[in-house]
Amino acid sequence: MISKADVVVGLAWGDEAKGKITSYLASKLDRDGRPHYSLVARWAGGNNAGHTVYVNGRRYKTHLVPSGVFHGISSLVGPACVLHPESFQGELDYLANEGFDTSLVKVHPNCHIVKDEFLDFDKQNLAEKLGTTSRGIAPSYAAKAGRTGILAKDVLSKDLLWNGELKGNVLCEGAQGVWLDLDQGNYPYVTSSTTLPYGACSLGFPTQKIDRVWGAAKIYDTRSGEDPLFPQSLLDNPELSRLGQIGQEYGVTTGRRRKVNWLNLDLLCRSVSLTGATDVVISKCDVLSELGVFKLYYKGDLISFNTIGEMKSHVFASVTQCSNLVQSITFSSSPEGI
């Protein structure tokens, strides 16, 4: 029986270091020296997501395989995910060649399959209009909703399929972010699945089992794909362009240059409240420090600060005021940990 579930969720538009946070949490040991979590599970999305993880100083990039594999923990691709078999196998081969035990990675039998024809449809009809990753995600979820999809149990070999049960402590690794949620985001410039913590329950446990919700954000905002909230003109702003260069803001999945803007603190506070985040990790503070310009949007105004310390204090006070569920706020300056 499952003891508890901790959920890692993005508080913005994705690319908030959820993989880093998940890897950090997955590395934790109990007093007896055993891993704190018995399972790390992806609960939504497909290989449109990109997670960057550092292990022993080396960088690894994944798309669908959960981050538990980096720490010898069973890892599950859940039933609400969508999976392209060839791409998934390529990711497993990559990790196996790097020395990781990919036999720990399993796929839920009810996970839906991304067919090649969905990739073609995505490229021809959605990529330019909405800025999708052309990974066939939307057509796959459309087929699922229309009950014409294909399940993993009908395609994948039995050795890849999960036949276990949820037990112990489960770490749920989210994809994308709150403002890409199908219902809460700026529709139609959204993803095709839920990105809110309750979506983790699709793994097969009640909401009462959710213990901590780790919310991931950055000290500035970034966006991949099309969205009127992030106009093309942002790419021409010298300070923001420099910030993107320092932060290496290019998509893990597509390699596309991300649009960068100053932190919208009002939206961050809304996403903290919406997700019920108990622990907030704000990354890339080292990047903003290197730029030496400290700005954010607050109540509709662009505010400047003399130091990053002043800016952090303002963010801390605002976030703690917007939700009484927040127990910790961490400002991270390391790509490898929190």
Give each language-model segment a name.
Residues 1-338:
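Non-transmembrane, aqueous-exposed alpha-helical and coiled segments at domain scale
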